[in-house]
Every structure is written in structure tokens, then in C-alpha cells.
Amino acid sequence: MNKMTELAKEYRIPTQATPEDLETRWGKVITFGDRVILVGYYYHPDGNCYFAAVYEFLDDDHTCEGFIGLREVSYKRFEDDGHAIEWALNQN
């Protein structure tokens, strides 16, 4: 199992889904071009509890029902969701 898959399992996020699936389970889901960004909260005692995940569309359907796959998960946790979003937007 690679590090990205391990983090997805730890944060309890799917490796494949639809944007609609993410929106029903997570509060911050942003469609940005051919990517979908998810920002979540995962408690950690050091106080940095926010993480980000970047999904990419796997087909031509870029609606809420399009199929997406996990491309990146932040190894670092952030102090707030804004910094997590910033990280996600900077991923190629």
C-alpha cells in the first residue's frame, strides 16, 4: 500500500468517487477545472488538524456525477482549511 492510499484510509476518504459522493460527506468540496479539491478535519493533538485531497476527473463528465480518482493527499496537516486549500491549488 503506498503512502497516499494509507493517508486516504487514515482520513477515511475514498480513492474513487463522484463529486456528489464527496459533497454529501464533507463540508468543503471545490470543483476547479479538471480537479476536485476536498478539505477535511482530522484531529491531531499538535493542533494541525486540516488536510487536503485532490481528485481528478476520470471521464468527460465533469458534473457532480462524473467519476473521479484520488491524485494527491497532503502529507502535512494544516492549521486551518484555508492553508489546506492553498496547498491543494498548488498541486499540479
Model-flagged regions — what are they?
Residues 1-35:
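Negatively charged, low-complexity tracts enriched in Asp/Glu with abundant Ser/Thr
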